[in-house]
């Protein structure tokens, strides 16, 4: 774990990167005319400033727990790539949960030392996915683990039946779009869930090895 003055020095360097990357995102917003400039300034000073503080807090909580030396982390290319890309993405969301996943990805990029191509793909997927994408992917990793799911009451049915029992607020049309995304991206192994199967099939794991690896990357 990074402690004391060493951690404070490292934290300041990381937060400097956050500041620079955040400003880079802001500078990419086209501004022209007095009204547009005024709106831009309000957004920058309020919503985006709040997001930057949320992101700094999420990073600090996780970085302080890394078991390593300052030099090892500072010289890790995967960590640096994840930090810069995730900072840019954090400015695009107001959801704390999404920022938490991004911060987890930064830490895990160091812990797992993922090669850069896969690292960039995973971070891009995290940018693309909504919280519901991740919720559904986590469900299909292990349907039996979810509270409120009574495995004994089913003999035949569709895996969707269990999902909608656990998450009754899900919209069916939105779910179809989300599940198609997950399938096309190679996160799940079953294309069509509109099928009837035995109870063991209903509760079967449906994430692929790539989907499992992606979940490990964004969770702590």
PLM region spans:
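Amphipathic, membrane-active segments
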Residues: 45-89
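Short acidic/histidine-centered micro-motifs embedded in hydrophobic/aromatic stretches
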Residues: 38, 42, 76, 86, ...
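N-terminal leader segment of winged-helix/HTH proteins
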Residues: 80-111
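Membrane-inserting effector segments that mediate pore formation, membrane fusion
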Residues: 6-58
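Long, helix-rich, hydrophobic modules that act as membrane-proximal anchors or helical bundle/coiled-coil regulators
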Residues: 99-220
